[in-house]
C-alpha cells in the first residue's frame, strides 16, 4: 500500500504526458496542413485530361523540363473538360487545356482568360457499328454523346446544319471522356465525339467515323490561363517557366513522335499498346505569353 500513491502519481504523470503529446500532434498537424495549403495556393496548377492534346504538359512535368526554382508545377487531372473549366473559373487552377467554345462560354460569364496558344486537338464523330449509321443524315432518333457549350456541341450543330434527318437527334451530355468511350464499347450510345487516343480505340473496334473536325476546317483546341495572373509578377515568372517547359516537350514530341513516349501515354490516357501502335501522326504547336509573341 505504501507504493500506491507513487503508482498513482506515475499514472497521472504518464497520462498528462500523453495528453501533451496528443495536443502537440494536433498542433503540428494543423501547422502541416496550413503549410501544405500555402504551398498548394502558391503553385502553378494546370488542369489536364487523359487526351493526347495534354501530352506536352504531362511530359514537361515528368521530365522536369522547366525551371523548378521559378515554378512548382502541379497537374490536376480530370476526365471531363467541364470539370477542368470549372476549376479554372473557380481559380483552383491557373491554366487549362480546353477548347475555344468552352472559352467563349466562360468569357460570356465573366471569366477573364488569357489565350496562350492552340493545340492540335481534333474530334471525330464516331457512330456505333451496330447503329448502322454512315452519315449525319442517318442520326435521326439516335443518341449523340457530347458536352454542352463545348467544341463537341458546336461540331454537332455544324454536322447537322442543312441536313435532313428522319427524326430529332438526341444530344446526350456525357462529359467524362473515358465513360463516353466505354459506352460506345458497351453499345450504350449510338454516336459520340471523341478526340485522341479514344478515337483511335473506337476506330480499332471498327466503329464508323462520320465526321471529322479537321475536314470541317475547325481547329478548336487551346491552352488558356486566368487573365488575372498577368498582374502578378510571380505568376508571370511561373507562366514563363511553364511555357518554356511546355515548348520543350512539344519539340521532343514532334521530333520523336508520341509513340516514343508510349509508357507515359498508357499511364495518363488509360489506353493500351494496340491503340498506341495505331495512333496517327500528331503535331504539337508552341504556346506563348502575349508579350513573347
Question: Where do the protein language model's features map onto the residues?
Answer:
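Bacterial N-terminal signal peptides that target proteins for export
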Residues: 1-7
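C-terminal motif of bacterial Sec signal peptides marking the signal peptidase cleavage site
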Residues: 16-17
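Short, glycine-/small- and polar/acidic-enriched structural segments
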Residues: 22-172, 183, 190-196, 210-213, ...
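Sec-exported extracytoplasmic/periplasmic mature domains
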Residues: 62, 89, 108, 161, ...
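Periplasmic-binding protein-like
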Residues: 118-127, 204-235, 239-246, 281-286
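Proline/Glycine/Serine-rich low-complexity intrinsically disordered segments
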Residues: 130-137, 161, 167-170, 181, ...
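Secondary-structure end/capping motifs
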Residues: 232-293
Amino acid at each position: 500500500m505504501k507504493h500506491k500513491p507513487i503508482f498513482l502519481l506515475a499514472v497521472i504523470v504518464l497520462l498528462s504526458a500523453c495528453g501533451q503529446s496528443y495536443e502537440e500532434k494536433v498542433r503540428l498537424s494543423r501547422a502541416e496542413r496550413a503549410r501544405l495549403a500555402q504551398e498548394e495556393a502558391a503553385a502553378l496548377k494546370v488542369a489536364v485530361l487523359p487526351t493526347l492534346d495534354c501530352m506536352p504538359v504531362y511530359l514537361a512535368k515528368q521530365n522536369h523540363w522547366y525551371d523548378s526554382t521559378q515554378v512548382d508545377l502541379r497537374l490536376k487531372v480530370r476526365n471531363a473538360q467541364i470539370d477542368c473549366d470549372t476549376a479554372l473559373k473557380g481559380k483552383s487552377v491557373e491554366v487549362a487545356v480546353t477548347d475555344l467554345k468552352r472559352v467563349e462560354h466562360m468569357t460570356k460569364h465573366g471569366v477573364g482568360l488569357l489565350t496562350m496558344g492552340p493545340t492540335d486537338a481534333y474530334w471525330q464523330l464516331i457512330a456505333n457499328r451496330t447503329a448502322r449509321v454512315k452519315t449525319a443524315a442517318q442520326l435521326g432518333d439516335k443518341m449523340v454523346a457530347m458536352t454542352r457549350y463545348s467544341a463537341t456541341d458546336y461540331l454537332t450543330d455544324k454536322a447537322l446544319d442543312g441536313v435532313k434527318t428522319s427524326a430529332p437527334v438526341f444530344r446526350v451530355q456525357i462529359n467524362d471522356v473515358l465513360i463516353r468511350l466505354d459506352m460506345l464499347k458497351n453499345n450504350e450510345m449510338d454516336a459520340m465525339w471523341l478526340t485522341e487516343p479514344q478515337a483511335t480505340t473506337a476506330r480499332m473496334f471498327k466503329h464508323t467515323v462520320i465526321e471529322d473536325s479537321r475536314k470541317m476546317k475547325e481547329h478548336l483546341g487551346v491552352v488558356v490561363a486566368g487573365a488575372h495572373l498577368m498582374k502578378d509578377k510571380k505568376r508571370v515568372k511561373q507562366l514563363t517557366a511553364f511555357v518554356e517547359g511546355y515548348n520543350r516537350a512539344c519539340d521532343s514530341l514532334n521530333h520523336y513522335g508520341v509513340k516514343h513516349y508510349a509508357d507515359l501515354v498508357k499511364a495518363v490516357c488509360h489506353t493500351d499498346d494496340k491503340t498506341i501502335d495505331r495512333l496517327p501522326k500528331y503535331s504539337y504547336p508552341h504556346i506563348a505569353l502575349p508579350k513573347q509573341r
